[in-house]
């Protein structure tokens, strides 16, 4: 086992504090409308420029291992806030820095660290309750635009694009951010259910000028197995041919004789038909076939349910207003499914999302939810250079996360005002002893830090502005972008409640652990280890006896 370096008490805390401050100072310069950029060097390609707190935090590793431990713990605050709400990483880092700095001063003055932590925790619990009372729902498009604009660093075009996307696909719809090809941001909306499986044969194409398969009011056959024998399909094909409607076949695979016969029938115009593979793999494929069947009002022909493809009828088929297929994707528009059944399926998927443990599973379940509930919107980010593209894309993703958080839990006045008002409301609470009271005051002082930093980044005097804001009431605050005071809601400066709440809770959680740290242990640096091993080597005294040898 490698030798360890151990530091205790004040010596350990000073090292840890230095690491906290290095990381937090790098992150906090990005806060607010007049926050600055941070340039990050990359091992390959051009440097990236960002105003995203968590992107800056992730890049920082310190040489001194004890200092690095402090930095990594604050990095954890930013990451947790980012995972929970998708934004508020800079605010969380700043709150953690303030609590750690003030808390360690109190520890150095002889306060009990555990009581300090209890006081901080009590203040945060009360603050979260007050935040919820202060919160107002974010229901209309205007409020969504304002939240998106603030989070995208005062870029109104991004805010309005996100609001438009949410309007078109619903609050539960999937909105993805991609790199565009032009200079301007664009919004592309795919209505209906789209999955990434194209036609099995180009001979199914019935729109040669566009290279698409378009089926109007088709029947949809869903089969949970591979089809290679045409005999299984004959009863369905005959029934569909009599109805004069087109047919879409979605199956695990379609090959050999079955595929060849379908192609010939389609080209001769006997039955207008197209075939695609079912999306996904394994259990996910079964679930997605079930989604499609509910959306279209049909049944999945599955041998597991003792259903026979040869004995199936038109009643087993789903229907839709339109189906469009290209070489990569299939889009089903306006399925004929029962609305109540679709709602029930959506509720079931939501429940699965709540129970899912892995991010990958959650992402796939959210995609399924969106396909059932409205559609998919793609925000294509435009920029002149690759460096600008990366920076812009990160900002748009932040704005999207912030608007989702706002719709979920509502909004509070932005610009650091919400935490200042909350601190005023809970300023009279008391702990069980004086040390806990000091912990409460540490948390209250930290709640002013975001406002102070926004003001500092805009070049004004933080103490003066903070006192002016405290003299006001309700939504009254300071607009750093225009250097004026007034109603933050009227200014359109809003923060999602979830973002502010998550930032405060995670900052207090990690900072409380750091305040109560008494010992730090790390591996000895390699050069120190090798020299100590060399000095203690068994043959190390041999050189001294060499002088008399001739």
Curated annotation (Swiss-Prot):
InterPro entries: Chaperonin_Cpn60_CS (IPR018370), Cpn60/GroEL (IPR001844), Cpn60/GroEL/TCP-1 (IPR002423), GroEL-like_apical_dom_sf (IPR027409), GROEL-like_equatorial_sf (IPR027413), TCP-1-like_intermed_sf (IPR027410). Its EC number is 5.6.1.7. Residues 540-550 have a biased composition (Gly residues). The keyword Transmembrane does not apply. Transmembrane segments: none annotated. Coiled coil: none annotated. GO terms for biological process: protein refolding. The keyword Heme does not apply. Keywords: ATP-binding, Chaperone, Cytoplasm, Isomerase, Nucleotide-binding. It holds the Pfam family Cpn60_TCP1. GO terms for cellular component: cytoplasm. It catalyses: ATP + H2O + a folded polypeptide = ADP + phosphate + an unfolded polypeptide. Signal peptide: none annotated. It is found in: Cytoplasm. ATP binds at residues 30-33, 51, 87-91, 415, 479-481, 495. Residues 525-550 are annotated as: Disordered. One of its GO terms (molecular function) is ATP-dependent protein folding chaperone. Forms a cylinder of 14 subunits composed of two heptameric rings stacked back-to-back. Interacts with the co-chaperonin GroES. HAMAP family: CH60. Belongs to the chaperonin (HSP60) family. Together with its co-chaperonin GroES, plays an essential role in assisting protein folding. The GroEL-GroES system forms a nano-cage that allows encapsulation of the non-native substrate proteins and provides a physical environment optimized to promote and accelerate protein folding. PANTHER family: 60 KDA HEAT SHOCK PROTEIN, MITOCHONDRIAL. This is Chaperonin GroEL. It comes from Buchnera aphidicola subsp. Cinara cedri (strain Cc). The gene is groEL.
